[in-house]
Amino acid sequence: MAFANLRKVLISDSLDPCCRKILQDGGLQVVEKQNLSKEELIAELQDCEGLIVRSATKVTADVINAAEKLQVVGRAGTGVDNVDLEAATRKGILVMNTPNGNSLSAAELTCGMIMCLARQIPQATASMKDGKWDRKKFMGTELNGKTLGILGLGRIGREVATRMQSFGMKTVGYDPIISPEVAASFGVQQLPLEEIWPLCDFITVHTPLLPSTTGLLNDSTFAQCKKGVRVVNCARGGIVDEGALLRALQSGQCAGAALDVFTEEPPRDRALVDHENVISCPHLGASTKEAQSRCGEEIAVQFVDMVKGKSLTGVVNAQALTSAFSPHTKPWIGLAEAMGTLMHAWAGSPKGTIQVVTQGTSLKNAGTCLSPAVIVGLLREASKQADVNLVNAKLLVKEAGLNVTTSHNPGVPGEQGSGECLLTVALAGAPYQAVGLVQGTTPMLQMLNGAVFRPEVPLRRGQPLLVFRAQPSDPGMLPTMIGLLAEAGVQLLSYQTSMVSDGEPWHVMGLSSLLPSLETWKQHVLEAFQFCF
């Protein structure tokens, strides 16, 4: 999936002019139209392969399914809540974001919110504008010596931590992915959630909105917090249960809250916004000139680099595709797809478990990107759905009734060939096993069911191969096969045979085109199949 045919991009939200310029300088056609209805968006996408949005455009399943040419959706920002990821993935559409673009702006807003909560600056400003001079009402608290709990220690959480440490705050945090050692490297003591609640004077959330993070702060967790805790949410509406927050504010369990995001935007229920101890903004986390310019620039560069085959970054729904752009991994992706195509041609439409096994130091972590490529080869011929690719392979293989396992064989130290990088694809419990490798940048078939090819058989994209197994003692076999090719009007381009395995070698013929039928062939050989990937 090289995206070489991605030629036209629609920008449907307001972005910095640098975005359009970078795309055009990269050879892409660009259309900019904003405030489109769903119907207008679908109409505009009919001749566009790419779409770039901010948060206003809703890329729903209806839009995705109606956009026949759409290949890539780019989100100029971090959150992809406005893109139906499941629908995009099912259709094989790549979704990208710019995770670095607005990190600093979001972190700075969070820090500003913490300071405003501590000193009630917005409330005091409103009082002054109302003609009042009320010094006693707005008694604040120092940040120095207070404990800040940071839930989510990604880019934004880290930036918040280092800035608030400068105010003398002690920073503790929680992140299921970041290790305690990494957290400690930027001054955060990582603790379990149940230990964080009673410790913190301030809590700020910086997680994506997932089922596991929805309502992370709720009636139960507020009850475990220190009385008078202050809460900041500049991440995603819904991470803090808004009803529970209001009850905590009303009871005094929560002394104040700063909200840049809401479950519904704009919020129709004004109870939180109107509460005197709540500071609120209309989702301004990324609303700085620098962030908008950075996000527009980053997503445009990502599109151009992708089209030119240089690199792929910011991928949300297809990590395997990122690896496909690596110079080392790219030929192995091609081998994996070829092996999957071979396996489908050989075993028919297999059911059960396909085993994908890597061997060799450089392939230690490659299984997760190679197995989707094997699936692409397996399903591409059999699937009656949309094109199978590295984006939707894992989703579609389950629906095809197949289970795919991935493992790594480190080899036995000192054993001959143990350091060789190999890819094995096999159907569990059935006599179908193929082993391949990469020579230079060329995928090669090394073995079929233990029968070794010396030299290996090149697996070149677009090159039809006929594979068959026959008795080694039949001297008339090869002339008969060549005669059958001539009758079908197919030229023989190459021919290789394996070493004898169980008395029967495998033969591989490179052909000018696939044969119309193998029925006649199967009368002369023990087994035969053909494929082209």
Curated annotation (Swiss-Prot):
The keyword NAD applies. It comes from the Eukaryota. GO terms for cellular component: myelin sheath. The modification Phosphothreonine is found at residue 78. Pathway: Amino-acid biosynthesis; L-serine biosynthesis; L-serine from 3-phospho-D-glycerate: step 1/3. GO terms for molecular function: NAD binding; phosphoglycerate dehydrogenase activity. Disruption phenotype: Decreased level of free serine, glycine, taurine, GABA, glutamine, and threonine in spinal cord and head. Impaired central nervous system (CNS) with shorter neural tube length and overall growth retardation. Severe atrophy at the thoracic level, particularly in the dorsal spinal cord. Poorly developed dorsal horn and adjacent mantle zone. Neurons fail to develop neurites, particularly commissural axonal fibers. There is a cross-link at residue 21 (Glycyl lysine isopeptide (Lys-Gly) (interchain with G-Cter in SUMO2)). Belongs to the D-isomer specific 2-hydroxyacid dehydrogenase family. PANTHER family: D-3-PHOSPHOGLYCERATE DEHYDROGENASE, FORMATE DEHYDROGENASE 1. This is D-3-phosphoglycerate dehydrogenase. It comes from Mus musculus (Mouse). The gene is Phgdh.
